[in-house]
Every structure is written in structure tokens, then in C-alpha cells.
């Protein structure tokens, strides 16, 4: 039994309640099908898988959550943590993974199935479990647009789902505008951060030097790292000690080489840290004085901004996608409207470096806002409330 009856005859689910019907005991049994590429929890990177793991952990006190994800050497085939069970499977392809995931789930009882970031999985899952409601939790526009799919195909895939959940209001609006036939299904749930793990660093409070800018994210063109490197050249005209640390991996070594050559040509000191384990990310943020997110493509949410803010770092970010839902300009961070221009970023970075009062104010407010709005507990509670409202 995964929940308990309260004195007033309702079953409690944190801030939500379900009336008992005909005296039946009901506890939500949720199946989450993760993408096929990275295990849950991910050793490093894998923001989608990281989110699945963190949210499921917060669900577990009230419901039973089963996760199916990829297996990798070093992982158990099955893990149990409280009311969360993770089954990991080997697969040679995306199609093979889905087939094995469905086979693994057969024979188990679920009240809802959540598919993360893979709309194309919906038809096969719906065919296998026709009576179970399916939600699609989307973390970006990548798998609902070219070259991964077409609008027409995504429309067909969404037919089998009763909920489409985006990780920001921006993504919610995009889904409603792009798929109007499914607009009634769309909701949003902001992501969160472990506020006990990510916390302000004594190093920055001591005002150490040199001035260090940090970036965390994939090394791909739409993340805007060349814009940041060029901005750093401008920053160094005012702050000669300024340097850049970059954490993140790339699928194309040639792109990383391109970034290194650009930094060398411009005379910007850049240290590439590579893929950093999740357990080491708090220390990475602690090494910085300012965090920059120079995204050039649509950033659905921008979880790295929340991690940096929880760490007490002043954040400078593109006014793009869901980022303004996290950062309010000159209150808890700095937004760059003209984010194609390196000098626009340089201006805000220099402000953080040369105005200690501003930096302290942004840092304090950023931490306060994350504590209030962006904890994983808050994420899980909102998602849970959406699911339970559909079960009434």
C-alpha cells in the first residue's frame, strides 16, 4: 500500500486529494519510459534523464513510480529506492528499445504512462496499453520538429496522448500554437534543482581572483559558445584577468576544436572541463564568479540557469524561450535581449565584474527565488496535481 487514508475520508497526495469512490483504495502507479540513449540516473549530462530521476524521487512518498531506461555497464538491471523502481534494458536501436520497454511493462499494472521527450513512442505504447492514459513530457522542441520529425507526424503521434507537458510556459505556448488540435491537452511544469546540493560558495564571498566566467551545457552551435568567447575578448579590455571555464560534452570533436581555435585566435583563456559528473557540478559552479547562458536557439527552460542561481552565481542569459520565466532582469540576474551580439553579453558580464553591490544583490535574490519557486519538490507536486486531477 503506497498511501494512507486521512481522517476526513480522503486519500492524501501532498497538496491534492482524491475522494474515495465505492470505498476503493487507490494509489497512483506511474510508469515513466525514458529516452533510449542514457541510463537513469545519468552519470553525467543527460538532462532529461536527470529530471526523470529527481522528479520520481519526490513522487515516491505518495505513489509507486516505475522507470524503464537504458542499461549501461556499471548499472544494475533493476534498482529499488523506496517506492521507485528502475528497470534498465539493453537495446540495439530506438525501435528495439521501445519493443523491449513495452515487453518489460507487460504484466504490470499502471494508472498512467509518462513518455519523456519521445513523442514517436506514443502510438506503439498506446497500442500495447489501450486503456491506460499517456502523457508526453517534453523538454525541448527537438523531437517535435525537423529534422527529427515533421509537424504532421508529431500531430499523429500526439493522438494517443491525453496530456502534453512542457517544462516552461514558453514551450506550452509553442505546443499550443504548433499543434492547435491538441491545445486542450497542453500544460507546463517548471523544472527544479536540489537546493541542498547547489548552494552559495565561500570562494565568491571572499572575492577571489581572477574573475571567472562559467558555462555549462552541450557544445553545439545553438548554445552560442562562440558568442560567449567573443564577448570574453571584449570583457578582458576592462577586466584583464577574466577567464572562461566550460563544462559539457560534444558529439563532434571537430566543433570543440573549432572553439579552441577561436579562443586561441582571440587570446581568450578558456579551460574545457569536458563532461562533468552531476556530483561534481556544484564544485564547478563554485569555481565561478559569473554564469553565462548565451543560447542562440530556442531554450525551452534552461535548467543550468537555475543550478547557477541556486549556487549564488549572478547569471547572464539570453532573453530567449523559457529563460525569462526564471530570470527577471536586474532583479535576480541579467538578460541579454540582443543575444546575437557578443558586445551585449560583454556589457552585462563587465557589470557583474565591476559592480560588487550589483553582483551581491543578484546573487542573494537568485538564491531566494530558486528556494521559493524552483525546487524539485515543487516540480513533483505540480506534476502530481495535474495527473491526479485527470483521475477524478
Feature locations, PLM:
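Nucleotide-activated donor-binding/catalytic signature segment of Leloir-type glycosyltransferases, i.e.
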Residues: 256-276
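Conserved donor-binding/catalytic core segment of Leloir-type glycosyltransferases
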Residues: 31, 165, 206-223, 229-232, ...
Amino acid at each position: 500500500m503506497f498511501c494512507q487514508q486521512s481522517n476526513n475520508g480522503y486519500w492524501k497526495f501532498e497538496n491534492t486529494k482524491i475522494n474515495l469512490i465505492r470505498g476503493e483504495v487507490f494509489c497512483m502507479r506511474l510508469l515513466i519510459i525514458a529516452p533510449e540513449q542514457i541510463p537513469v540516473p545519468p552519470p553525467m549530462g543527460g538532462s532529461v534523464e536527470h529530471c526523470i530521476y529527481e522528479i520520481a524521487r519526490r513522487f515516491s512518498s505518495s505513489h509507486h513510480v516505475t522507470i524503464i531506461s537504458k542499461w549501461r555497464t556499471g548499472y544494475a538491471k533493476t534498482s529499488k529506492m523506496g517506492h521507485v523502481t528502475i528497470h534498465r534494458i539493453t537495446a540495439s536501436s530506438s525501435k528495439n528499445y521501445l519493443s523491449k520497454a513495452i515487453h518489460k511493462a507487460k504484466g504490470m499494472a499502471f494508472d498512467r504512462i509518462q513518455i519523456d521527450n519521445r513523442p514517436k513512442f506514443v502510438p506503439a505504447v498506446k497500442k500495447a496499453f489501450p486503456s491506460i492514459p499517456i502523457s508526453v513530457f517534453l523538454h525541448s522542441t527537438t523531437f517535435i520538429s525537423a529534422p527529427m520529425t515533421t509537424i504532421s507526424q508529431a500531430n499523429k503521434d500526439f493522438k494517443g496522448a491525453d496530456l502534453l507537458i512542457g517544462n516552461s510556459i514558453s514551450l506550452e505556448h509553442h505546443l499550443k500554437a504548433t499543434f492547435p488540435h491538441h491545445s486542450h491537452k497542453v500544460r507546463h511544469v517548471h523544472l527544479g534543482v536540489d537546493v541542498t546540493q547547489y548552494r552559495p560558495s565561500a570562494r565568491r564571498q571572499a572575492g577571489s581572483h581572477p574573475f571567472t566566467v562559467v558555462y555549462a551545457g552541450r557544445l553545439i552551435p545553438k548554445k552560442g559558445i562562440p558568442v560567449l568567447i567573443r564577448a570574453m575578448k571584449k570583457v578582458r579590455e576592462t577586466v584583464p584577468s577574466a577567464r572562461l571555464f566550460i563544462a559539457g560534452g560534444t558529439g563532434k570533436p571537430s566543433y570543440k576544436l573549432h572553439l579552441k581555435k577561436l579562443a586561441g585566435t582571440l587570446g581568450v583563456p578558456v579551460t574545457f572541463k569536458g563532461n562533468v559528473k552531476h556530483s561534481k557540478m556544484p564544485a564547478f559552479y563554485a569555481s565561478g564568479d559569473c554564469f553565462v547562458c548565451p543560447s542562440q536557439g530556442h531554450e525551452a527552460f534552461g535548467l543550468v540557469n537555475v543550478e547557477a542561481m541556486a549556487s549564488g552565481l549572478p547569471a547572464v542569459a539570453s532573453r530567449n524561450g523559457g529563460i525569462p520565466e526564471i530570470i527577471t532582469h536586474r532583479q535576480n540576474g541579467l538578460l541579454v535581449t540582443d543575444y546575437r551580439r557578443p558586445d551585449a553579453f560583454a556589457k552585462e558580464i563587465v557589470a557583474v565584474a565591476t559592480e560588487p553591490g550589483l553582483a551581491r544583490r543578484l546573487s542573494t535574490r537568485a538564491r531566494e527565488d530558486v528556494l521559493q519557486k524552483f525546487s524539485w519538490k515543487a516540480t513533483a507536486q505540480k506534476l502530481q496535481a495535474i495527473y491526479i486531477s485527470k483521475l477524478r
